[in-house]
Amino acid sequence: MSTTSLQPFAPSFSPFPSTQSLGMAPSQTIGLDTLAEGSQYSLEQLQLSREAGNDAATATSSTSLRSSSFSKSTDQSVSNPSGNHHSNNGPPSDFKSSQRDPLAEARSAIRKNSTSAPVRRRISRACDQCNQLRTKCDGQHPCAHCIEFGLTCEYARERKKRGKASKKDLAAAAAAAAAAGSTSSSTANDGGPMLTKGHSPSDGRSSHEINGRYDPAFDAARTLTNSAQSQLQSHADVPGMVGMQNSQQPHSQPPLGAALDALHLNHFSALNESNRPQMSVPDLRTLQMLHPSGTNPRSPSAVLPSQGLNSYNETAYSLMNPQESNPASMNHFRLGSSAENQPPSFLGLSPPAQSPGWLPLPSPSPANFPSFSMNPYPSTLRYPVLQPVLPHIASIIPQSLACDLLDVYFTSFSPSHLSPLSPYVVAYIFRKQSFLHPTKPRVCSPGLLASMLWVAAQTSDAAFLTSPPSARGRVCQKLLELTIGLLRPLIHGPAPGETSPNYAANMVINGVALGGFGVSMDQLGAQSTATGAVDDVATYVHLATVVSASEYKAASIRWWTAAWSLARELKLGRELPPNTNTARQDGDRDADSDVDMSKRNLPSLVTSVGHGSGTPLNVTEEEREERRRLWWLLYATDRHLALCYNQPLRLLDKECEGLLQPMNDDLWQAGDFGAVGYRQVGPPIECSGHSMFGYFLPLMTILGGIVDLQQAKEHPRFGIAFRNSSEWEHQVLELTRQLETYGQSLKEFESRYTSSLALGAADNETIVDGGHLDHVSPSGRSSSTVGSRINESIVHTKMVVAYGTHIMHVLHILLAGKWDPINLLEDQDLWISSESFITAMGHAVGAADAAADILEYDPDLSFMPFFFGIYLLQGSFLLLLAADKLQGDASPSVVRACETIVRAHEACVVTLNTEYQTFRKVMRSALAQVRGRMPEDFGEQQQRRREVLALYRWTGDGSGLAL
């Protein structure tokens, strides 16, 4: 065999086998194909091999004759390139011919002796998705599994066979490598040209014929210029080459490990025809996206070239060494120096800097990474904003499902006004269009994106999450672990590549080492930090919200505390100070072309944001509004959880007295910042809109005052003196006035959106504006007439008024009555006979009437399930007290109110099931007593009732709902 047929530039080289279609992605999952064979198949092969070994002893002469005849036919087939060859990727022909007949006879004997039903034939190959998910595949294209779950069905991974390579092929490859090295070195010493006979077109064709795997699609790889040849020569002429030539003899037969050591990793030669696994280019590209050098890991990674790997050009292989100054040399094999052969940092999949070692992140699988697919298979990534998190979720969920989950996150409850459909999205902090922009999305941290997918996966109805039933729990658990790992809790310093030169010196401040907590002097003096830090606060909010709605409410305080603390450090409660516009450099103008179109004409303000004091940075009005909405959301949840968990307030009114109130949600999603008009500052106390910031935030402002009053009253030393002073009465009157102001604004809000005058001009307002409906939900455009949209708006308005009225009455009860249910039932101070009890009882009946309206407009209580439970519970305690004390003498209004509360609790359990809502059992037993049905074990039921209520205490040391 001529040595010129095995050249380093063999045109038959392909990053994936030539038997594949060029339209498939050259991705593979190394090490998983050997697990695809079942145990039954392995036992059958073992039995066949044993019988073949027994038969081979009695058929030696015939086998040798067949072997010689088969070798002759093989030589003839080499001279005939049009023949079909299948021995290049398998073991030597002598081995196959020696066991062909015994194997065939053994198979026929097994089939004759089998009395069972016909054995189902195994498919030759499973698709990439089924292979990765370890599911059954029918071998079709597309297969039934991918069609059912809407996955991309591909057969792109490399075909691999078992066993080690043939010694003959390894020896020939080593000899060819040594001959090629000696030829290259002699040519370089003579100063002659690089081209030799081995690179002539005729020899190139003969090499294809001998290899038996000629593919004309890769002819472009043979057209090398003289400059490229000289670059190859410079890379090939290195000291390591001589050692390799001297150590390997042409006719020796080294073992497999020695042969692989002799050939460099990037030496693409006829060794690709053997059975050793090849380096997968998509694997390297995926790992490169995990640890990009010189880029911000919080920004979207650059998408890899869209063109396919039709030839191994410099673009496709430049990612293998991003520091290479001459990427064109990557077209050829390269025997680098010792400095170049250092193992890259990303090959070990070590966690990124500053990340905790307690969370093993799953390595991304390239099988589901659509950026590497060829041109005939377009990418399924509808939303480029997901690019930073794609390498991390590739082994968890498909790309199409990730896009669907992002849609679920931004889906609205109502087509007329914005209201999140997911019970775990309490308010919209970000603009939907900024996230779902097809070309210029918002730059997001991977942790925020992972948390959004995790929140949406809690309630999504996608088939991938519902079949089998355990799929949702498994996927949500993986997304949760990924979110925590990407968030790096309590570590919010600069990411790798963003650190300043004096960052290490700033890690020790006044003798205190702060490096473990990601604190630097630059950040302590800044007005804010980069957008990634704001994303971290939003990620904490997502984690805390879902945990708060579960049975682990006490654990949610950790996440809420982290969110409140980081928000205070970032000074989200303050407006960023405006500054004079500074002259922009040419580079800034060029960078402006990459900004979202909705942000270009916005008034930009210059401030120092996480880059040291005095560093100018343009902050758009959208980014300012994100900061405001994030603060006001944390402000509202702080007061809500202070009631739930019987805790003092964390965020004070003083911290945000100069902060603008959130803008209208419809205008916010439309990006119409110029139409906002006059805006008030400080905490609001009047209803102003349909969103959580419009009707619920004012109630939480008033609740904060009630919580402060309650904490002062329960103070162990000063509480008694405060309750008996005139200051107590003054504070109660002020809070009562604020509640009355809110009630009046609620009536004005209802009349403004439901009166005939408002309906006459509705065509020009946001409730029927099609442009705004595009930002609400896909179903917003389903209403065909203006009348139906107006009706939806009226229903939504009445539902908001019902919820606001109910919570307002509950706040009246909290202000005038007792919070703890056991103290209510014991009634040691005879509060039940006071005037304040009669006032509070009237508000309890009013709250029950509002609950009846809520059940009429929102039967399943899905409008605000995260917030509503505690107010329903606190509004029920007085009714329970009346039913327990009065029993059969209760008024019809009290009985009707108790029935309404029981219905509301049952509906609330269906929507958002939590343990404390078993209070409905207590209410049912009390309602039975009111109707005259006295059980025989009346004393036991009363004792059991108090045991249930004793779990949730609002006394001095009680923890409320946090068990």
Curated annotation (Swiss-Prot):
Segments of this protein annotated with the region Disordered: 1-30, 46-121, 178-213, 322-349, 576-597
Gene3D superfamilies: Zn(2)-C6 fungal-type DNA-binding domain
Compositionally biased region (Low complexity): 8-18, 56-93, 178-188
Basic and acidic residues bias: start-end ranges: 200-212, 585-597
Listed GO CC annotations: nucleus
Biological role stated in the UniProt entry: Transcriptional activator of the xylanolytic system. Involved in the regulation of extracellular cellulolytic and xylanolytic genes and in the regulation of the intracellular activities of D-xylose catabolic genes in the pentose catabolic pathway (PCP) in response to the presence of D-xylose.
Family designation: Belongs to the xlnR/xlr1 family.
Annotated protein name in UniProt: Xylanolytic transcriptional activator xlnR
Protein species of origin: Aspergillus terreus (strain NIH 2624 / FGSC A1156)
